[in-house]
Design a protein with these regions (language model features):
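N-terminal auxiliary segments of SAM/dcSAM-dependent transferases
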Residues: 1-57
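Conserved SAM-binding loop of SAM-dependent methyltransferases across substrates and taxa
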Residues: 116-133
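Conserved class I S-adenosyl-L-methionine
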Residues: 105-115
Length: 301
């Protein structure tokens, strides 16, 4: 009974730390959120979940996470560098000119294999900095096979969204990519733009197997589309990005597949201190426009 109570107390303590971190995200942005998640790690997770155990349980973070402790460890290890990379690529593709005019826009954002929605948070951070969103409607579609991670993603997007004036809705899908494409291919409503975010997923073999079906889906969504993909400098990731680019039709290449790097301040779990480190990645940005079925029929007639 004593051991059980201690375990329950430890779980509650982690949950409180994560809730505090989410509040920091809402109040101050991603950097403070990351610092608070590192605080959760050093408060005790480093003892209960050392890196070697985490790497074994998650196949070095390649399989879906199963606990909040694993999510905290993942964020401590990779969250800041992943955010900085995606944030850098969004700014490079979409530009750094501030848009102060209050225009009306509806935007769908699909975050595939979203994890803790790092890509969506980076997009929200960009919008907060550069775009007047008071007349925006943002529809987030978060696709993630881990329920634990998906719940955290919904919380974080909710918190970060409160920093901008847009009307935001969040649609969570506790599914892998294959199931999402089979069962939910009709979910996106009418929008001025649909953004498709891929952060550290196109190097995964199971995702690459779905690229033909994924491209059919991307071409079925009406209107203007943008694909932003970022991942590690692994051979599998180059393969996944090139496969996606070559499988899509009539695209405008905003950013071809290319290496890049950013500097991040991260916490080293192996050395137990903060450090500045260059984070290396591969990026790609594509745009295309799909004609509606009704328009195609009218044109053919």
């Amino acid at each position: 009974m004593i051991a059980y109570n201690q375990t329950e107390k430890a779980v509650q303590n982690v949950a409180q730390h994560v809730a505090h971190a989410a509040d920091q995200l809402q109040l101050h942005g991603f950097d403070r959120y990351y610092n608070a998640m590192v605080g959760a790690y050093v408060s005790g997770i480093y003892k209960s979940l050392p890196y070697s155990t985490f790497a074994h349980l998650t196949n070095r973070a390649q399989t879906p996470l199963t606990s909040v402790e694993q999510a905290v460890m993942y964020t401590t290890l990779y969250g800041k560098s992943h955010f900085d990379r995606f944030n850098s690529v969004i700014a490079q593709i979409m530009g750094k000119n501030k848009r102060t005019e209050a225009i009306t826009r509806t935007i769908n954002i699909v975050d595939y294999g979203c994890g803790q929605a790092i890509a969506s948070l980076a997009l929200l951070s960009y919008l907060e900095k550069y775009v007047n969103c008071e007349n925006f409607t943002l529809n987030f579609y978060l696709v993630e096979p881990s329920q634990t991670t998906l719940d955290l993603a919904v919380l974080l997007v909710t918190k970060m969204s409160s920093r901008i004036a847009a009307n935001v809705t969040i649609h969570p899908y506790h599914k892998d990519l294959e199931c999402f494409l089979k069962e939910d291919s009709e979910v996106l409503g009418a929008a001025d733009y649909s953004m498709h975010l891929f952060s550290n997923v196109l190097d995964i073999a199971e995702v690459q197997q779905q690229i033909p079906r994924l491209c059919e889906y991307l071409h079925s969504v009406e209107g203007k589309q943008m694909v932003i993909a970022v991942g590690p400098q692994y051979s599998n990731n180059y393969q996944g990005l090139q496969q996606l680019k070559c499988s899509l039709s009539d695209v405008t290449v905003k950013q071809d597949v290319a290496d890049f790097s950013v500097e991040s301040e991260i916490y080293s779990v192996t050395r137990n201190h903060w450090k500045h480190e260059r984070s290396y990645g591969v990026m790609m940005g594509l745009c295309f426009k799909n004609i509606s079925t009704a328009s195609q029929t009218a044109f053919a007639a």
